[in-house]
Swiss-Prot record:
Subunit structure: Part of the 30S ribosomal subunit.
Matching PANTHER family: 40S RIBOSOMAL PROTEIN S14/30S RIBOSOMAL PROTEIN S11 (PTHR11759)
HAMAP family: Ribosomal_uS11
Protein name as catalogued: Small ribosomal subunit protein uS11
Database matches in NCBIfam families: arch_S11P (TIGR03628), PRK09607.1 (NF007176)
Record flagged with keyword Glycosyltransferase: no
Amino acid sequence: MRQMNKTGIAHIYASQNNTIIHVTDPTGAETIAMVSGGMVVKNDRDQASPYAAMKAADMVSEALKEKEITDLIIKVRAPGGNKSKIPGPGAQAAIRALSRAGLKIVRIEEVTPIPHDGTKKKGGKRGRRV
């Protein structure tokens, strides 16, 4: 009987202010590794940068190699709701760094929450005036 590849789920939350990479087991119950952009850079303004996301992904891939996880399902998330539905600058860099680290990417999903007429957007009655 051949050995099954160990799979993990990488939840990448990429906003304009930070990038968080959180890897769990397939059920989502157990955290395997969690690194944010703020853990790898000194300046707060660099937390969301592609460089910080790349370094965070490298730290995550080291932890995954220790746990012998070879396959990854990636779920990319933006702030969503009534905020931005576009992932921040660190999302693509994190995915690229994870694939370069030798991990097999099974699939990439977009899981940004979409409002079904939820709460009111900020900006007042007439919206943001420029």
